[in-house]
Amino acid sequence: MTMHQDHGVMKDLVKHPNEFPYLLQLAATTYGSPAAPIPKEPDRAFCYNTLHTVSKGFPRFVMRLPQELQDPICIFYLLLRALDTVEDDMNLKSETKISLLRVFHEHCSDRNWSMKSDYGIYADLMERFPLVVSVLEKLPPATQQTFRENVKYMGNGMADFIDKQILTVDEYDLYCHYVAGSCGIAVTKVIVQFNLATPEADSYDFSNSLGLLLQKANIITDYNEDINEEPRPRMFWPQEIWGKYAEKLADFNEPENIDTAVKCLNHMVTDAMRHIEPSLKGMVYFTDKTVFRALALLLVTAFGHLSTLYNNPNVFKEKVRQRKGRIARLVMSSRNVPGLFRTCLKLANNFESRCKQETANDPTVAMTIKRLQSIQATCRDGLAKYDTPSGLKSFCAAPTPTK
C-alpha cells in the first residue's frame, strides 16, 4: 500500500470507525499466515510473478483457493489476460487482432509461440508466453481441455466485436458473456472436476450471471478511462441505454450534462443488478469453504460496488472505488451461506432506502426497486432454509443443498 493509499484509508476510518475491526479481521485472514513462496520451477515462478505484476487484487483471490486450484486458476487468468491484451492493444490493426484472436487457442498448445508487445506491463507475458503453456500442459487433461475450449470460444467472441459498436442490451449481454460469463462457466466446471462443489454448481445460469455481474460493474467503472482512450475511445455501454439520455456517449463528459449522465448511470447499474439474484442462488452448491468464500468475495464486492456507483457523478470524472473498510466488512460478513444472504439482504435494504430518498424521480427507479426487492426475497428464502440451529450458523462450508 502506498503512502497515498494509506492516507486515504485513514481518512475513511475517521469517517467510518465501525469498519476498523473488519479491516483487522480481513488483514488477519489475508496476511496472518506466511505468504506462499514463489515456486522454484522456472515456469511456475514466471507465472506467479507475472500474476502479481499484471493484477493487484487477483493474486489474493488465487491464494484464497484450495492449493489444488491455485495453479489452474493462475494459468487460466494468464491465458485470458494474454487474450485480453490482444483485444485491448490499440496499436494493432483490426484485421490483425481479429485473425490473432480467432487462432489464439492454437498458441495455447505451442511452446514456441510468442509475441512482441509494447503494451505496458503485459509485454513480458506475451514475449514469454511459452512458460505459461509449459505449466498449462502439467494440469489434468480435462482441465487443459476446458481452458483451451474456453480460449477458443472467447477469442472468437472478442473477434466478432472488434469493429462492432454495441447497440442493444442483448449485444451487451453477449459481449459480456464472451469475455466474462464464459470464463465463469469454465472456472465452475473445473471446480466441479476437482470435487469442490456439487454437480448442480455447473450451471450456465449461475456461472454466466456472476461473470456478467463482474464485467458490467467494471464497464460502468471504466467510463472515464475508456472514453479518453488513445488513439480512440472503445466503449461498451449499449446505445439502447445511453441513447435515451444523449446524442453521443461522450456528451456525458460535459459538466452541463451531468444530470442526464447520472440518470443513464443509474440505468446501467439497474441493468447490471439483474445478475445478482441468479448469482446468489448458485452459491449454495459450493461445498468447499475456501472456494465458497473466494466466490462470495467476488459477489458481495460487486454488489457493494454497484451501490457505490449508483447515482455517483464522480463516475464521469474518475475511477470510483469502494472504501477498503467497507470491502472488509462485506467480505468478513459473508464467510458462510447465512452470512452471505444476510450481507446481501442488508445491502439491498440500504440500496432501496437510498433509491426512495435520493432518486425518487429517476426514470428507472421503479425497476431498480423491483430488482432490489427480488434480491431481498431470495435472501429471506435463503435464510429461512439455511440459517438453522443445525450448524449452518458456524463458520462452516457452504452446505450441500437438499432437493
Swiss-Prot record:
EC number: 2.5.1.103
Keywords: Magnesium, Metal-binding, Transferase
Catalytic activity as recorded in UniProt: 2 (2E,6E)-farnesyl diphosphate = presqualene diphosphate + diphosphate
Alphabetized InterPro entries for the sequence: Isoprenoid_synthase_dom_sf, Squ/phyt_synthse, Squal_synth-like, Trans_IPPS_euk-type, Trans_IPPS_HH
Keyword Plastid: no
Single biological process term from Gene Ontology: lipid biosynthetic process
Name of the protein this chain belongs to: Presqualene diphosphate synthase
One term under GO cellular component: endoplasmic reticulum membrane
Family membership: Belongs to the phytoene/squalene synthase family.
Transmembrane segments: none
Swiss-Prot/TrEMBL cofactor(s): Mg(2+)
Chain's role: Catalyzes the biosynthesis of presqualene diphosphate (PSPP). Works in combination with SSL-2 or SSL-3 to produce respectively squalene or botryococcene. In most other species, farnesyl diphosphate (FPP) is converted into squalene in a two-step reaction by a single enzyme.
Alphabetical list of Pfam families matching this protein: SQS_PSY
Positions annotated to bind Mg(2+): 84, 87-88
Keyword Transferase: yes
Molecular-function annotations in GO: metal ion binding; squalene synthase [NAD(P)H] activity
